[in-house]
From Swiss-Prot:
The gene is dnaA. Signal peptide: none annotated. It is found in: Cytoplasm. This is Chromosomal replication initiator protein DnaA. Residues 74-108 are annotated as: Domain II. The lineage of its organism: Bacteria, Bacillati, Bacillota, Bacilli, Bacillales. PROSITE patterns: DNAA. The keyword Nucleotide-binding applies.
Amino acid sequence: MENIEELWSATLKKIEEKLSKPSFDTWLKNTKAEALEKDTLIISAPNEFARDWLENQYTNLISQMLLEVTGSELNTKFIIPDSLEEIEEQKPMPKPKQSTDTGDSPKSMLNSKYTFDTFVIGAGNRFAHAASLAVAEAPAKAYNPLFIYGGVGLGKTHLMHAIGHYVRDHNPNAKVVYLTSEKFTNEFINAIMDNKSNHFRNKYRNIDVLLIDDIQFIAGKESTQEEFFHTFNALHGESKQIIISSDRPPKEIPTLEDRLRSRFEWGLITDITPPDLETRIAILNKKAKAEGLDIPNEVMLYIANQINTNIRELEGALIRVVAYSSLVNQDIDASLAADALKDIIPSSKPKEITIPAIQEIVAERYHIRLEDFAAKKRTKSIAFPRQIAMYLSRELTDASLPKIGEEFGGRDHTTVIHAHEKISKMLEQDTELDRDIEELKEKLKSI
């Protein structure tokens, strides 16, 4: 075999002869051979559920077919697309061609599946999508930096990769780099240890578009924040585009230096909220079409009604239903979907935690009156429980900052931010307070 693609293609043909069409299409049709490391073939699956199923159910069959194709015993390792960055870093570097390139340019690490074409637009992400497209069409001219925030699995990373792909498609010479703040931190630490700080700086200050994910993780890391501050200034000063994502807006990231916070606010800040029902159905339809699946509308509606948290869980539920159908050899309908998802959908949704409920529990714990939360008193015996209640309101409810402030005597949203940051910092060092907070959370969840 000349390459691993041919090897895997030949192996898949043999596997297809051994399985039913639904089983093959569900589990193996969308797999891809990514690398061959010594005696281990790295195979990517479309999602975590498929990866786990392949490991548990098909490892022996795949190994047997690989033996027939290659004449050698090969091990297998199953990964998902998010793991490809790690694999790329482990591959031996090819012999470089003669070039004026210094070798300092990092790889872009863009996921080919995350483009604007595959992004489903809805009410919760429409503005973020429009801003991302504007930045992609005119880097460093529309909004710089672009700061996208929102919960896990809502599409922040998808939009960042989409920007990267668009820029590279329209300007192949552009140096586009995507990485997480954790990777930035780890590379920076390694550069210091290896006495290669200048190499690190050249690497990230000589690019055209920087996409950095989960920036909240550099909070509290003074040296990393210092380095990123200068990287930001160098790129921005040269009119290079910077796109940043986080799980919260800059003003709510605790222990983030003010100078970074202010720079993150120079451009445009946009959020992504959980998809509404119509968007969830559209996401499921697009996923089904991409996977070549024919799913009844009633099943799409059922899944969309049951899974309303984020896109990853939504798509995972769809794959789970398809997998279950293949396993039990039954057609997909709403009843089968309910059986397939019964382990991940609670029989009854947990009761919503409200700010008044938080105030009642905190008042009882700290022996204050409910009216003290709205009072102007600033004594420690009142102010501290009030800050605890504000912190819990921010952590456990979907209420906006102004709404929380309103529930505490009409206080300004900045007071809520201050309370949340103060308690967050205290929790890092005060184990007794951490224990108290956890007990309060458990009480609230059991109401």
